[in-house]
Amino acid sequence: MDSRGRPKSYGGDFIRTKLFSKSPVQASTAGRVTDYGNGTYVARFFLSFPGRLHVAVKLVHSSEAVQVLKRLQEGSLARRVMVCGFQEETDPNPEWMQCSNTPNKSLNLRDVCDFSNPLINVSFYCQRPESSRCVSFVGCHRDHAATLAMHDKMATEEEKKLFTRDRDLHEELPRDISVQVKGKRRVWKVHGKALPLCGPRLPETASEGYWFNGAWTSLRCQARRFRTVESVVECLHNKTVFFRGDSTTRQWFRYLMILLKLQQHGRGAQPVFGIDEKNKIKFHFLFHKFPRNQGPVMDGNDMGYVAEEIDGISGGKDVVIIITLWAHFMAEPIQTFRSRLYGIRHAIERLHSRHPDTKVIWRTPNTGHHHQFQHYVENSDWYAYQLLHIVKEILGDLNISIINVWEMSESMWHDDDMHPPNDVIENHIDLLLSHICPL
């Protein structure tokens, strides 16, 4: 139905579907939706477990809302305001100027501080301060008030109504559709054939996998369980693991640090690391550089552009690089993300030309929780889903592992959360270690 209750004759809605059972086991899997463009949608599920299964459908965004999001994403400006400080040693206070990953075309080039690095496909510009030099750059933060004012002008009042909680089906409906599935649950096999070992360039499948009593079963590769400290240590023995990206990468870093009871060196937004001297395991996390969506001032020296970081890493068979780039890019023009990915792609190719046995692992986006217009404008799941496909398009043919956690997130038993709870992260780590240490 459209906004007036009439049957739709066009597609474009952003829909999620799930097949699940609650008894005697708790199991679930995400469906894949085909949009026929005429108001008709078909959800397909890979039947992986037997029982009385129920179907749930969730309208995340109507097609009208998607058009608004698409218009904003394809624009030339970010959907947040970032200001950066410039301060000479003799000045008591910094000058705060607007900065962005895209140039402000209304400014003369003489009025711009250009911090771009074309060698790694990075662009970053600031309005030149009146009394400070460009080299006096001290840090940046999100201007929340200016960002909200910008959001208010980005859509009409009618368009904003498309994102109210009573417009979309935030509850999964209907709950009275069920099917009886018979047969036996198979592990590591699909249609009688063994799944490949976890690693790069895995073939596409009808489903990423399914939840079964709290454990994720992959249908893409032979993922194992690493539920003891001993099994994790055995996998990571003598390895140096670099975590590069956003807070969802840091969540993996922290999980492993706590699991192995390692002391964290460094704090806050600074680079942090942990070392297990006995087992020769090293973890190192560094947040990616701009764009960043953060209120407190961020020191640029505490961050690094991922491509630049890759160029500075000495690879080898005992080196693992884990990358996640999405949460802070959803509010950027789509070309900013594409450009950044190409820079990272070239850096990975340079790394593998030096050390072809270096493992590179990319973690995809997952779903998040939104309930205000500003959240949708900056961080809608529709944006995250587009970034997922761009990652596969630009990086999919490289010798890297892409761990797709989207369907894990869609079908989990928890509410949507950019930072899923620990029992979900535990299953993420199983996948990660299965790619580092395949059978």
Language-model regions: role of each:
Residues 1-439:
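A compositional signature for long Ser/Thr(±Pro)-rich, low-complexity
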